[in-house]
């Protein structure tokens, strides 16, 4: 057997109890403006993963997203770490996924609190969660730490800022996982 094929088999599959089982990925994302949604769709296609959109029960308006206004909805939510915006409840069996690629826009150097809502709504026990984000200029900050308490039985790792959203950037990132 070709050595490269063996390597590919070991890298792309999970070994459990003497059997190789294809690991299954889910790309879950929240996008208020459409930027993260575009990136998430490209990641799902490249990773051959299922796609799940995290949607707010009350959609965000342009005024809600005005970070310059301290009374805007996003500013109020981000100033209260206990805030958990309601999400649309959707049926999904998280037990069928090994790895979750979780995407969101960066708000105030971290994930929007709606991501905490998502992590507290579903069971992520034993899951690997890799973060990706879009941002106008800030990085992940303390995002991993802020999210870990919402999914304490999962392993959450900082992935990548995918601001350009080019096919090559996304392809390279997915291959690096």
PLM region descriptions:
Residues 7, 11-99, 109-111, 116, ...:
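N-terminal beta1-alpha1-beta2 submodule of the flavodoxin-like/Rossmannoid cofactor-binding fold
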Residues 130-163:
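Short, glycine-/small-residue-rich phosphate/pyrophosphate-handling segment
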Residues 104-105:
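Glycine-rich, N-terminal phosphate-binding loop of Rossmann-like dinucleotide-binding domains
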Residues 108-109, 137:
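Acidic catalytic loop of the alpha/beta-hydrolase fold
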Residues 47-49, 127, 154-155:
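A structural micro-motif
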Residues 94, 120-126, 150-151:
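Short, conserved loop/helix-junction motifs that constitute active-site signature segments
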């Amino acid at each position: 057997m070709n050595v490269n094929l063996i390597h590919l088999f070991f890298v792309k599959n999970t070994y459990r109890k003497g059997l190789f089982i294809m690991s299954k990925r889910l790309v879950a994302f929240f996008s208020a403006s459409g930027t993260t949604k575009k990136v998430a769709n490209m990641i799902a296609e490249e990773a051959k993963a299922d796609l799940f959109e995290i949607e707010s029960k009350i959609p965000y308006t342009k005024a809600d997203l005005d970070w310059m206004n301290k009374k805007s909805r996003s500013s109020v939510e981000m100033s209260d770490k206990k805030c958990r915006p309601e999400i649309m409840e959707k049926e999904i069996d998280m037990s069928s996924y090994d790895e979750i690629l979780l995407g969101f826009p960066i708000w105030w150097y971290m994930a929007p609190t709606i991501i905490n809502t998502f992590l507290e709504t579903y069971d992520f026990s034993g899951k690997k969660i890799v973060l990706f984000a879009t941002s106008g200029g800030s990085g992940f900050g303390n995002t991993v730490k802020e999210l870990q308490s919402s999914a304490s039985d999962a392993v959450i790792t900082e992935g990548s800022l995918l601001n350009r959203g080019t096919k090559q950037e996304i392809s390279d990132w997915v291959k690096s996982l």
